[in-house]
Amino acid sequence: NAANDLHDIRTLLASIYPKKWLATGISKGGSTTMYYRAYFPDDVAVSAPYVGPMNTGVQDGRHEIFLRQNAGTPLQRKAIEDFQIEMLKRKSRMMPLFDKFVEEHNYRFKVDNKIIYDYVVLEFSFSLWQWGKPVHKIPSLKASDEELFAYLMKEVDPDYFLHPDLNDTLSFYVQAAKELGYYGYDIMPFTEWLDVKS
């Protein structure tokens, strides 16, 4: 349906914008960009999807395996996992910083802040690779709580997990849960420190 809608818009506006067209999008929009190109290859001159997931089911499972075994080098994957473990080991010291951050940003969640903190730490590996951030910029594990926390918040803002009433992408999450699918988290290396259990 989205590809048909885009084709109708392109057809309607062709007389106003007669030159070459570009289609782009991120996440679901990236997928839509690819579908649009597949169904209407002559509508646009360029298709530029930024992150265009093609999940095979509601619980795809490929992302976790890829991040655990294939993303980057073994040393990079270990550095990311070590950072995540350190952030979880320090959770009791990080929670006052996290609670303050949440309060300063007027964030509200459906679950306890400790659960959201876990999700932020779990999201870190996917987010780092998705946005192409350099692994060598991860601070030393001997850095202060404040330095490690600031780095984590820069890379994974907890606004991603906002209460549905405050999240303008709620409709996407509903569709992802019911139709499109979404990635999960590999929690095995972290279970002893997590408050979230699945």
Give short role names for the model-derived ranges.
Residues 27-28, 51-54, 181:
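Short, flexible loop/turn elements at secondary-structure junctions
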